[in-house]
Amino acid sequence: MAKNEEIMNVQKAFSKNYLPLELLMLNDKLSNSLPNGGLPIKYKDTLSNDDVISLEISKQGAKKPIIMPVLLYYDDERVKLNTGKPWTPYDRAVHDACATLYEAGYEYFTADMVYRAMNGLTDKEKVSPQARGAVTKSLDKAMSIRLFIDYTNVQSTYKRGKNTEIIVDSQLLAADRLRAKAGGYEVTVYKFLRKPLLYEYNQTTGQILKIPNELLKTKSIKSTEDVIVIKSYLLRHIEAIRKNRRNNHIRYNAIYEELGIEDPEDRAIRGTLYRRRQAIHKLLN
């Protein structure tokens, strides 16, 4: 249980509870590269200089691509047994919600608050134990993964600072976890220790979508992990279509890849694919 002073701070923060009116979705090259093994996650005890990846960042009007050294790794040996899994599109959606809460001025937050931010819900709408558990696992994973990133060249190209060296090695989500009473219940509360790292980097490029809560609500369909991933993909792709009308098709296979479905032709998962297509149609309508 947190110390009395910390508990008072939590209760004070939640007494002023208000909800963000929109969700921030990070849409830069780094955030787009992380999910489903786009950037492999290494382990601290086996790291070498060869593991650093040179991520190529493009910018309209730039004379040449920007090279950004990046390394993603698990900081704790124990996660090999627990959460040593790739960063998924669902984890990305959770991180976007954390960035949203941080930007809205929250110092403390809960898994329920993250889920509500992901789905445009109010604090009156309940969160199921399953949904809370999925968010909690994702938060724990983000707190276990560290990102080394040198975005000095990006900073310079986007003219955010001259001759400024920006090298960061920190958790994707730097937060303390504590138990406290809020609203009469004992809950797990997280406290931001710094700005979520992907959001911090994103503010250099400014490639961010702001999605009104009305577009996040899925009353006609249960907001499962897969539905949240599909919804996030569709919102990003629709924004891309707005910018380039020639690329106005939504491919099922691209969504299947986002969901981690490797072989859509596998007859054993026909039922799963049918349900996912139904979800896509309902979300688009």
Pin down the residues of each PLM region.
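Charged, alpha-helix-forming regions
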Residues: 1-285
